[in-house]
Amino acid sequence: MSIKHFLTLQDFSPAELKQLMLRAIELKKIQKSGEIFEPLKNKTLAMIFEKSSTRTRISFEIGMSQLGGHALFLSPRDTQLGRGEPIEDTAKVISSMADGIMIRTFGHEVVEKMAEHSQVPVINALTDDYHPCQLLADMQTYYEHRGSIEGKTVLWVGDGNNMCHSYINAAKQYGFKLRISAPEDYDPNPRIVEANQEYVEMIRNPMDAAENVDLIVTDVWASMGQEEEQKKREKAFKDYQVNTAMMQQANPDALFMHCLPAHRGEEVSAEVMDAEDSVVWDEAENRLHAQKALLEYLMAKA
């Protein structure tokens, strides 16, 4: 039997992604009711973190605990990875003992190589190219507040980064139109755009791009590893802040999302972050429920 991995949204069909979202909502209700539900009892998830994290670590650790399993935290300091052990060797060893591997790292090729040599499911918890777990939470959050996102129009404002790339994949998999508004020199990977071009439109002016959209999403201007570019990026992105004026260009029931952490006064104004149409806190909580559905799907029968 072939092993199922989750490296990008394209690893699952649209039907699987919808099933996963509905299951996440069910698991959320189960958890809120206080019912004990442990389909992953005696299962272990090895979590490899080469990038620091708040929401990812907490949500996966608590998720495994609530599902009856155990999560093992591994950093480069704790393993031979930090001393140069090949990824393929690490994958073979860890997958011979653990029931699943979650990895948060820099190069996407690291995750791909891990999956290639693993005997158990591998989950991409973020690379420089993609952040698919966040999209599971975002799509669940939109569904809970506004229903199906199919046929809607979403605006990504800011850096064409890993989150933007996953939104491009999501446009195809969930059936929405995606507008991307980024400064020159900060567009998403053209290869990823071209592969999904019928779902994606590039609009340089962010106020024009925001007109009549149903959801506006942004992220920090300087991601992890780009701190030295902070001043340069602040200058390049100064007209790309999501603020009240931009939200007023959108449809009256448009939502605002941000994967967090957010820098109020930079990529988003404090007013928008704390407004009624901001669902960032539900979005953050849904990392837990969406990933529980993913863990159950990949590991319960493995």
From Swiss-Prot:
InterPro entries: Asp/Orn_carbamoyltranf_P-bd, Asp/Orn_carbamoylTrfase, Asp/Orn_carbamoylTrfase_sf, Asp_carbamoyltransf_Asp/Orn-bd, Orn/put_carbamltrans, OTCase_ArgI
Reaction catalyzed: carbamoyl phosphate + L-ornithine = L-citrulline + phosphate + H(+)
Top EC group: transferase
Pathway the protein takes part in: Amino-acid biosynthesis; L-arginine biosynthesis; L-arginine from L-ornithine and carbamoyl phosphate: step 1/3
Enzyme Commission number(s): 2.1.3.3
Cellular compartment(s): Cytoplasm
Family annotation (SUPFAM superfamilies): Aspartate/ornithine carbamoyltransferase
A GO-annotated cellular component: cytoplasm
Binding positions for carbamoyl phosphate per the UniProt entry: S53, T54, R55, T56, Q80, R104, H131, P132, C133, Q134, C259, L260, R287
Any one Gene Ontology BP term: arginine biosynthetic process via ornithine
Predominant location category: cytoplasm
Binding site residues for L-ornithine: N162, D219, S223, M224
Stored Gene3D superfamilies: Aspartate/ornithine carbamoyltransferase
Keywords (A to Z) from UniProt: Amino-acid biosynthesis, Arginine biosynthesis, Cytoplasm, Transferase
UniProt GO molecular function: amino acid binding; ornithine carbamoyltransferase activity
Purpose of the protein: Reversibly catalyzes the transfer of the carbamoyl group from carbamoyl phosphate (CP) to the N(epsilon) atom of ornithine (ORN) to produce L-citrulline.
Family, per entry: Belongs to the aspartate/ornithine carbamoyltransferase superfamily. OTCase family.
Record protein name field: Ornithine carbamoyltransferase
Species of origin: Hydrogenovibrio crunogenus (strain DSM 25203 / XCL-2)
Gene name of the encoded protein: argF
